[in-house]
Amino acid sequence: MLIIAIDPGINGAICFFENGEVKDVIEMPTMAEGKKNKRQVNGHQMFNELSYRIKKYNIQNINVVVEQVSAMPGQGVTSMFNFGQSFGVIKGICAAMQLP
């Protein structure tokens, strides 16, 4: 059983566990976007990273866990929108890849 644990923040990470052992940890793939070059989750790179690491597994033997997070005091509306967008990209990629 492969467990993929995801910390969805821009400074987050993706961890791959198998049989109680950490197999790999990668930083959240990001890219600069917009006039201000704000960092966002790079969905294309995340798809590639996940695809590469799960290719030898049967989809039924994979579970994905995404950290459930909420707003923190003092965070502005824009920050929360950006975070929600990153969260949505991650969930969308997992859904498109049919990862449970």
Predicted features by range, described:
Residues M1-P100:
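Phosphate- and other anionic-substrate recognition elements at nucleic-acid/protein interfaces
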